[in-house]
Amino acid sequence: MRYLILLLFPLLSYSQKIYSVKYESQSDIKVYVVDYESQSDLKVFKVDYQSQSKGNEGLWYFVDYESQSDKKIYFVDYPSQSDLKIYFVKYQSQSGWRNKSKQHLLY
């Protein structure tokens, strides 16, 4: 039984449901997308299915409606305007926090 749990644990990776708003005043968090991984607070991987949604590990599912979201974000034009700097990664295994002091923003 213990081995079964250890084998299934990686399958239990979850994401958050994110909605991108049009106006800054509607957002929970202001986000800036950086050019380099080393500049980011969070490395984000976009997941394909809503069923993977929960948790706070940089796995994001973008929903179509605000009411479906866990968090509403607004993409800003400059790093100084942001609460959180993110970098989009190519693989799910690369996602995660680089700056854990900002982790509270997505709870």
Predicted regions and their residues:
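Sec-dependent N-terminal signal peptides
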Residues: 1-13
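Repetitive, compositionally biased segments used for assembly/scaffolding
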Residues: 16-107
